[in-house]
């Protein structure tokens, strides 16, 4: 407690200078509460307003797929190079060292597998557990046009409402129904619906034609999914084109941890996202870093 015997009147009020407060100028976040903006400022670099997320949540429906057999051996060495980790609470508690001190986007939907209809998901994490785990956001699929579209949208709404109560951003992940074309028209629809429901971040796929229209029509930040494994040069070109056309980052898994050299690859992706390197320059970096 302060010593009450030596209280002095303050003198340095700088009355000639108006009070300032630096805004976190992220797309669509100007009206959000301080706590939610603070979490978003950990996900998106405040200087570049971009992010490189490392996704290794695939096991929630795929099991121990290639590259994720041992998270502690294959994925843990990548943690220090990622801006954000995207994983399930089971892996977070059992494998991720708390001292790594990286922001976490927590997978919060599930209850399906590759053996069944993928769109049939439920909310799989209570919001108080996401807070308990010090998550910076929670993520769930939204399957527009699928058999279980209605339930997936309800899942997102449930998480958004719970997130608003505690200052937790929600990332809506646009899953694709079996019979849906992966084109600009579909992803414009899916991303806009998720944003209209109140999601603060949208994860979607890059498309070669019209991606700039998807990004422009979405009022909150978009990060692109890496999708299936591509040759490194092609994956870096996809990153470059997405960022150039309005994406706010990437959320990559297989194109990093299934790479010939995952550390070199995540460094190359970082160069594209945060330093505007071309795919050609980034690929040269990958080759030079490749062990």
UniProtKB/Swiss-Prot annotation:
Signal sequence coordinates: none
Q: Which UniProt keywords apply?
A: Cytoplasm, Schiff base, Transferase
- EC number(s) of the enzyme? 2.3.1.245
Please state the protein's primary subcellular location: cytoplasm
Which GO cellular component terms are attached? cytoplasm
Does the record bear Metal-binding in its keywords?
Answer: no
Induction per UniProt is: In the absence of AI-2, repressed by LsrR. Induced by AI-2, via release of the LsrR repressor.
Q: Kindly provide the name given to this protein in its UniProt entry.
A: 3-hydroxy-5-phosphonooxypentane-2,4-dione thiolase
Species of the source: Salmonella typhimurium (strain LT2 / SGSC1412 / ATCC 700720)
Tell me the organism's taxonomic lineage: Bacteria, Pseudomonadati, Pseudomonadota, Gammaproteobacteria, Enterobacterales
């Amino acid at each position: 407690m302060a010593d009450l015997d030596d209280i002095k009147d303050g003198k340095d009020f700088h009355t000639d200078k108006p009070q300032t407060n630096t805004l976190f100028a992220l797309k669509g976040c100007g009206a959000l509460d301080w706590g939610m903006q603070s979490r978003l400022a950990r996900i998106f670099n405040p200087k570049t307003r971009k992010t490189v997320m490392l996704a290794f949540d695939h096991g929630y429906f795929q099991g121990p797929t290639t590259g994720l057999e041992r998270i502690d051996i294959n994925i843990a060495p990548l943690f220090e190079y990622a801006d954000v980790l995207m994983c399930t609470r089971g892996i977070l508690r059992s494998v991720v060292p708390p001292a790594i001190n990286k922001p976490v986007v927590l997978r919060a939907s599930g209850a399906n597998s590759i053996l069944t209809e993928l769109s049939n998901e439920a909310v799989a994490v209570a919001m108080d557990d996401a807070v308990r785990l010090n998550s910076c956001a929670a993520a769930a699929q939204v399957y527009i046009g699928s058999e279980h579209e209605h339930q997936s949208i309800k899942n997102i709404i449930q998480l958004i409402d719970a997130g608003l109560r505690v200052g937790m951003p929600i990332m809506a992940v646009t899953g694709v129904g079996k019979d849906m074309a992966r084109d600009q028209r579909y992803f414009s629809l899916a991303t806009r619906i998720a944003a209209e429901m109140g999601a603060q971040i949208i994860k979607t796929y890059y498309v070669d034609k019209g991606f700039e229209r998807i990004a422009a029509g979405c009022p909150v930040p978009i990060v692109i999914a890496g999708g299936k494994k591509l040759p490194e040069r092609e994956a870096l070109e996809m990153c470059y084109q997405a960022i150039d056309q309005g994406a706010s980052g990437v959320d990559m898994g297989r194109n990093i941890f299934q790479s010939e050299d995952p550390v070199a690859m995540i460094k190359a992706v970082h160069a594209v996202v945060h330093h505007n390197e071309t795919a050609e320059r980034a690929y040269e970096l990958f080759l030079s870093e490749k062990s």
